[in-house]
Amino acid sequence: MTMLISLPTAPSVPNYQSLERPLNFTMAAAAKVRELIQEENNADLALRVYIQGGGCSGFQYGFEFDENRADDDLALETDGVVLLVDPLSLQYLLGAEVDYTESLTGAKFVIRNPNAKTTCGCGSSFSV
């Protein structure tokens, strides 16, 4: 017996070089990244945002510091701080905003993604 599993199709690979600003990296996010990079004492670091399978809605966001930039990475600079996104992740993030928020419940990086059809209550998982 053969079982077929249907996976959601990814949006077409974007030509992000033709877009003026494929996603928004806010001043608040850049300021927090700068602070964290200074704590690491490594000026070569950039914040990498990526999408991976998982979470309760199918996909989840990931953040990490990275010294390495691939040739096909999108590199956005805000106030001297670099945000890196690989092409596969970018197709799910076009038009999104990467921000940093502080509230009584805590502080965190957030992604406001217009491509997400549903999001998890935690805010780190979504579906397309």
Swiss-Prot record:
One of its GO terms (cellular component) is cytosol. GO terms for molecular function: 2 iron, 2 sulfur cluster binding; 4 iron, 4 sulfur cluster binding; iron ion binding. One of its GO terms (biological process) is iron-sulfur cluster assembly. Keywords: Iron, Iron-sulfur, Metal-binding. SUPFAM superfamilies: HesB-like domain. Homodimer. HAMAP family: Fe_S_insert_ErpA (MF_01380). Belongs to the HesB/IscA family. This is Iron-sulfur cluster insertion protein ErpA. It comes from Xylella fastidiosa (strain Temecula1 / ATCC 700964). The lineage of its organism: Bacteria, Pseudomonadati, Pseudomonadota, Gammaproteobacteria, Lysobacterales.
